[in-house]
Structures are given as structure tokens and as C-alpha cells.
Design a protein with these regions (language model features):
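Non-catalytic, usually N-terminal nucleic-acid engagement modules in DNA/RNA processing proteins
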Residues: 1-73
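Catalytic cores of enzyme domains
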Residues: 30, 68-240
Length: 240
């Protein structure tokens, strides 16, 4: 069993619904990470995803619900335990590894993490970048949460998936802040503003964070609205 298979098997056995590998060369060329130079020791990123509970997502209307907020936090915690386990496994093979938590903001003003989980997931073949900027998997739609592990372990990268949003505009129509511009792309967007009125989205999630039982800058409406999440899955993932 090669190292890529070892890591993917471990991830799936410990809760990941999806796992892929991305080459870090494009990210290093873009020279973006927080802190600067974070990626220097590493050659690959492992993207892990866990599916969100369908029934919880389906009960979202035009704002997040307290049960979605709790589910969001719970899945993030499970992902963080999984990435810690992957790091421990990689270190046992005498390679370097560093976990990027599922939901850690390094730049509060611009709402940026150490590295974009979504960008890594797209390159790792987890899904394509939708008009909402969420990663959309053919089976799960955008109903996933993501985390990342950086490593210098020699792994086999996965191929990105073809964008399948087409003319669909359900996320844009549902967006409570009219943030989604409904701009199509064959690959990915050059930046947030190409796809979103980002200040609209950021302002609305700040507003939602003050609702009773929420306490986080979340929304979930575009997650609920995407046809891929609705059409491709029967039932809900296992409760965690």
C-alpha cells in the first residue's frame, strides 16, 4: 500500500467522507499564506471533507438555525481531531506535517484563514468552485465542511473536477444579501469579488451571528439552495 493510499484509508476510517491531495506549487507561486512562508517546508496538502446532516440543512430558510450553528461547530471539532490524527500518522513516517483547523480566522478584517480550504479542496478534486465560492461535490453538493493538512510527504495529487454549475442560479436567487453575482467560470475565480459582493456576504453573516443561538459568522442559505446537495444524496450522513 503506497503512502497516498495509507493516508486516504486512515482519513476515511476516521470520519472523512471525502479526501484528496493537492500539489502546493500553485499556492506557493501565488505567495499567499498566513503567516507568510507557512507553505515553504511542504510539497502537498491533504483536503478532508465531512458531509453535513441533510435534515439540518433542509430546515434552513432565509437565515441559519441554532441547530445548524451547533452542527457547524461539532463537525469542525471532528475535522480538527481527524487532521491531528493525520499529522500524527505522517510524523510516524518521519515526514513533516501541519494541520490547518477547519474554522480559524487569521485576518479578521478580510475573514481569511492560513490558507483557503476551498482552494485546496478544488485542486484536490473534492469538488468544483461554485458561483457561491463554495466547493460543490457531485454527491454532497456544498453540504460539506473542510480541513487541510500540509505535508512534505511525497503523495500523488488528484485532478480537479470540471465545473458543472452551468446556467443554474439557485444560490444567487436564494442569497439573503444578494451577494452572489451569478458569474460562470470553467475553472475558478480570480478573487472573491469576481463572484461575490463580498461586503454584502460579510455584513449579513455578522448580522446573523447576533441571532439567538447562532454566535458565529455563518449563513447556510446557499448551502441549502444548491440542487446538487438536494438531488444527489438520499438520506443523511451518519450522525457525529
Amino acid at each position: 500500500m503506497n503512502l497516498t493510499t495509507v493516508l486516504k484509508t486512515y482519513a476515511r476510517e476516521h470520519g472523512a467522507d471525502l479526501v484528496g491531495v493537492a500539489d502546493l506549487k500553485p499556492f506557493k507561486a501565488a505567495k499567499f499564506s498566513l503567516p507568510e512562508g507557512l507553505l515553504d517546508p511542504y510539497s502537498h496538502a491533504i483536503s478532508v471533507a465531512m458531509g453535513l446532516d441533510n435534515e439540518i440543512i433542509n430546515r434552513i430558510t432565509d437565515h441559519p438555525t441554532p441547530e445548524y450553528a451547533e452542527h457547524y461547530r461539532s463537525i469542525n471539532s471532528v475535522l480538527d481531531r481527524l487532521t491531528s490524527g493525520l499529522v500524527h500518522l505522517i510524523l510516524g513516517y518521519h515526514y513533516q506535517a501541519h494541520p490547518i483547523p477547519a474554522s480559524r480566522i487569521m485576518d479578521e478584517k478580510n475573514l481569511l484563514g492560513s490558507i483557503s480550504h476551498k482552494a485546496v479542496a478544488r485542486m484536490a478534486g473534492i469538488g468544483w468552485q461554485g458561483k457561491s465560492l463554495l466547493i460543490i461535490n457531485p454527491d454532497f453538493g456544498p453540504r460539506i465542511r473542510l480541513a487541510t493538512v500540509l505535508t512534505d510527504m511525497p503523495l500523488e495529487p488528484d485532478a480537479p473536477l470540471k465545473n458543472r454549475c452551468g446556467k443554474c442560479a439557485e444560490c444567487a436567487k436564494a442569497c439573503p444579501s444578494s451577494a452572489i453575482k451569478n458569474i460562470s467560470t470553467e475553472s475558478h475565480y480570480s478573487g472573491r469579488e469576481e463572484a461575490l459582493h463580498f461586503s454584502n456576504c460579510a455584513g449579513k453573516t455578522l448580522e446573523f451571528s447576533a441571532l439567538p443561538g447562532i454566535g458565529a459568522r455563518i449563513c447556510g442559505v446557499c448551502v441549502m439552495a444548491c440542487p446538487f446537495g438536494k438531488k444527489s444524496r438520499s438520506g443523511s450522513p451518519k450522525v457525529r
